[in-house]
Amino acid sequence: MKKTKTILDILKMKSDGEKITVLTCYDYATAGIMDGCGIDMILVGDSAGVVCAGYDNTLPVTMEEMIYHTKAVMRANPKALVVSDMPFLSYQIDLATARLNAGRLIKEAGAAAVKLEGGLNVVATIEAIVAMDVPVMGHIGLTPQSLHRMGGYRVQGRKDEQAEKLLADARAVEAAGAFAVVLEGIPMRLAERITRELTIPTIGIGAGPSCDGQVLVIHDILGLCEKYSPKFVKQYVDLKPIMAEAINSYIAEVKGGAFPTEGHSFH
């Protein structure tokens, strides 16, 4: 029987030079498909607020929503390592609040690890959560919960001063005890340097091919997002017309009396 991946497996993948595959997931059915394909990590992202709930950004997402989505994913009994996002205001207020909410994602929702955004500014938070024996994944660069400070979704680290700040953030996140770090929306050469200097895995999203792993939003690779698709996204299939064809066929058959047939009925 295939064993469930742990953070030790993910760390070993970096040392072995094996690329780490990560996708977001928010529901039971998709988690089962994903896990059957052998994905290494599942990220229950606060991006659920955008792709599932229709919010303009991730800021409105609540702890209750993250627990709901994480529980749904965990019911598929995935062998992938499941990481749950800590939403905005779940860890920024104080360390006690951060510890409580991280613990809820593990105890109530069933995740194996949590992810939070920030660098030097969240070192104490990462340390406090790790001290509870809760694994933490960091997230630096383009951090969606900081979109107002950044003036929107902009590539970070193009200037030398910004690049050095991000390198310091990456080192700080590792030193604080994170087992991995997401690098989002940064120049590929900077991501390559960070990946080379850290002992923990880097998971890229819009950070080039040199990261130890890659993560994308599942709705993006399936062509299910109606909103703007960033440059770093690769759409592997366009499911929208396939879904529309099935729905249109259903509507036509019901309207025309072709469904249900006797074979779909009880006697």
Swiss-Prot record:
Protein's pathway: Cofactor biosynthesis; (R)-pantothenate biosynthesis; (R)-pantoate from 3-methyl-2-oxobutanoate: step 1/2
Ligand binding (Mg(2+)): 46, 85, 117
GO BP field: pantothenate biosynthetic process
Primary localization class, coarse: cytoplasm
Cofactor annotation: Mg(2+)
Reaction(s) catalysed by this chain's protein: 3-methyl-2-oxobutanoate + (6R)-5,10-methylene-5,6,7,8-tetrahydrofolate + H2O = 2-dehydropantoate + (6S)-5,6,7,8-tetrahydrofolate
Binding residues for 3-methyl-2-oxobutanoate: 46-47, 85, 115
GO cellular component entries: cytoplasm
Record has Transferase as a keyword: yes
SUPFAM superfamilies assigned to the protein according to its UniProt record, in alphabetical order: Phosphoenolpyruvate/pyruvate domain
EC numbers: 2.1.2.11
Entry's Gene Ontology molecular function annotations: 3-methyl-2-oxobutanoate hydroxymethyltransferase activity; magnesium ion binding
CDD domains associated with the record: KPHMT-like
HAMAP family per record: PanB
UniProt family annotation: Belongs to the PanB family.
Functional description taken from the UniProt entry: Catalyzes the reversible reaction in which hydroxymethyl group from 5,10-methylenetetrahydrofolate is transferred onto alpha-ketoisovalerate to form ketopantoate.
Name of the protein this chain belongs to: 3-methyl-2-oxobutanoate hydroxymethyltransferase
Organism whose genome encodes this protein: Geotalea uraniireducens (strain Rf4) (Geobacter uraniireducens)
Protein encoded by which gene: panB
